[in-house]
């Protein structure tokens, strides 16, 4: 799959519909957008730079390294290109997925060393991104800061030396979808798909 070639079998389309809750018409729209944006460099699929350009409007408060890490998480076959299924799945996780799925991905994104725990520097990065995104969305700075600190506080960690594990992070942040919205993982408005 890739630029100009997002033809999926009926079974693959049905699988995407079931997995993502997108309709057939939405899958068709995503296919058109994928073909348009992924063909800029004449390579097959979404490259890292095309991914960053495409998602910059949503993640303008994220630094480039974090966007590269996000790309790598979605590039499940590790070939440096997002094929159409990976692209649709990435949009689903960022917009329509249940809060727990979004939080699981966010944990993996910020657990840069893949230790299974968010250490101090990783938590600081998470807090910085959440505060920047939240305030750019019009949320009160002190309210955003206090909320994020309450999620990442030592009270929510069973092993304060190692840091917060994935289960603890999800439990602390999943009381509502507020944290996901703050970090720009929110369902799009109206008819927009991303």
From Swiss-Prot:
Ca(2+) 1 binds at residues 75, 77, 79, 86. This is Calcium-binding protein J. Belongs to the recoverin family. PROSITE patterns: EF_HAND_1, EF_HAND_2. It comes from the Eukaryota. One of its GO terms (molecular function) is calcium ion binding. InterPro entries: CNBL1-10, EF-hand-dom_pair, EF_Hand_1_Ca_BS, EF_hand_dom. One of its GO terms (biological process) is regulation of signal transduction. The keyword Metal-binding applies. Ca(2+) 2 binds at residues 111, 113, 115, 117, 122. SMART domains: EFh (SM00054). Residues 62-97, 98-133 form the EF-hand domain. It comes from Dictyostelium discoideum (Social amoeba). Keywords: Calcium, Metal-binding, Repeat.
């Amino acid at each position: 799959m890739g630029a100009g070639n997002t033809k999926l079998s009926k079974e693959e389309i049905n699988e995407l519909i079931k997995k993502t809750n997108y309709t057939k018409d939405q899958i068709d729209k995503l296919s058109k957008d994928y073909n348009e944006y992924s063909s800029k460099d004449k390579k097959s699929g979404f490259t890292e730079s095309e991914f960053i350009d495409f998602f910059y409007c949503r993640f303008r408060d994220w630094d480039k390294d974090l966007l590269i890490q996000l790309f790598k998480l979605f590039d499940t076959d590790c070939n440096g290109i997002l094929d159409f299924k990976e692209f649709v799945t990435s949009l689903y996780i960022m917009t329509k997925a249940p809060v727990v799925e979004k939080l699981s991905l966010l944990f993996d994104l910020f657990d840069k060393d893949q230790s299974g725990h968010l250490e101090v520097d990783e938590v600081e990065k998470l807090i910085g991104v959440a505060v920047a995104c939240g305030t750019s969305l019009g949320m009160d700075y002190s309210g955003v800061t206090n909320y994020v600190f309450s999620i990442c506080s030592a009270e929510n960690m069973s092993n304060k030396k190692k840091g917060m594990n994935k289960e603890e992070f999800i439990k602390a942040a999943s009381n509502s979808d507020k944290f996901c919205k703050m970090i720009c993982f929110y369902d799009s408005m109206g008819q927009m798909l991303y």
